Amino acid sequence: MRNSVEFSQLGLKTAFNLSQNKTYTSAVKKQFFSTGAFLSNGGNIDLNKHTQKNIDSKYVACNSRSVTPPNDVASSVSKNTLRHKQRLMMAQWLMSPEVQKAKSSSSGNVGLGPNTNQPFPLNPFFKPPRPISHSLRMKITDEYLQGASIEVLARKFNTSPQRIEALIKLRRINDEFEEKKKPILHSYNEVMEKMLNACTKPEMMQFNDGNDIPLRSNPVSLWKSLPEGETFTPQEAAKILKWPSIEELNMRQNATHFHKTSDEHKDLNEDEELISSSPSEVGKRVFRLIDLSTGNVYRRDTGGDIYVKRKKSTT
């Protein structure tokens, strides 16, 4: 039988399955009760030498309002072990002196640190993207209303097209509220922007929406929605892209080849004389050579024939 032991404290939940193997069972029990003792005693118990050795290096003084990120867990451990160590690191951080001091502080501005762009700098596990301020959102949407496309704005402000679309939707809702004279909490917005250190300038924005980077600077959208089952031929795609169709390209190529052949026949005037023919020397180009001593012009065509145009004597 496999028994399940579940423990929950300080918002941390750990589950361990105990198997029939005595060695595995004793090891898991030891790990479980060490975790429980650590949390119940306020995080002062020694978990292991490595954790105790590095616990001082994970934190700095609260006056600087900055915490060194926790040590990286080895990538070779299993997922369950990784989650367990992450929970222990979070528990250690919750029991750290700087967090306890922040909890007991009477100041309401505990989520901000001086000279930092990260909100809640005391928490090394909190790394969200910076929001966009109301003034910058209005600037972006104003350019959209003036005719700028979504992709151009995404490239200009270093963000994704999806985020620009979301800002446009928010602008529409904001305009609807103003038309209906519904109250808008501008003061709350200003407070939250200060707390989260929102971006107020375009150069402060950082792309953080995955790999969906706008690659094209073409302001014309080339997306086309089709009903299910409807065919979309290459000819229709060529019309939308304003490209010539394959038939037109073939006609142009044939016409060019015809003109080249006609030009070659024009060169076969009465002044030229066939002096040599070699089918083994067939090529793709026509060569012309001039004999500077006599002034004669030699031409070898693509079929391997060599012609000469002798210079007329001026007597």
UniProtKB/Swiss-Prot annotation:
Membrane-crossing residue ranges in chain numbering: none
GO MF annotation, one: structural constituent of ribosome
Transit sequence range: 1-66
Subcellular location: Mitochondrion
A Pfam family this chain is assigned to: Bot1p
Record keywords, A-Z: Mitochondrion, Ribonucleoprotein, Ribosomal protein, Transit peptide
A Gene Ontology BP annotation from the UniProt entry: mitochondrial translation
GO CC entries: mitochondrial small ribosomal subunit
InterPro entries: Ribosomal_mS45
Entry keyword Repressor: no
Subunit details: Component of the mitochondrial small ribosomal subunit (mt-SSU). Mature yeast 74S mitochondrial ribosomes consist of a small (37S) and a large (54S) subunit. The 37S small subunit contains a 15S ribosomal RNA (15S mt-rRNA) and at least 32 different proteins. The 54S large subunit contains a 21S rRNA (21S mt-rRNA) and at least 45 different proteins.
PANTHER family linked to this entry: 37S RIBOSOMAL PROTEIN S35, MITOCHONDRIAL (PTHR28158), SMALL RIBOSOMAL SUBUNIT PROTEIN MS45 (PTHR28158:SF1)
Function: Component of the mitochondrial ribosome (mitoribosome), a dedicated translation machinery responsible for the synthesis of mitochondrial genome-encoded proteins, including at least some of the essential transmembrane subunits of the mitochondrial respiratory chain. The mitoribosomes are attached to the mitochondrial inner membrane and translation products are cotranslationally integrated into the membrane. Required for mitochondrial protein synthesis. Has a role in mitochondrial integrity and cell respiration.
Family membership noted in the UniProt record: Belongs to the mitochondrion-specific ribosomal protein mS45 family.
Protein name: Small ribosomal subunit protein mS45
Organism this protein belongs to: Schizosaccharomyces pombe (strain 972 / ATCC 24843)
Organism ancestry: Eukaryota, Fungi, Dikarya, Ascomycota, Taphrinomycotina
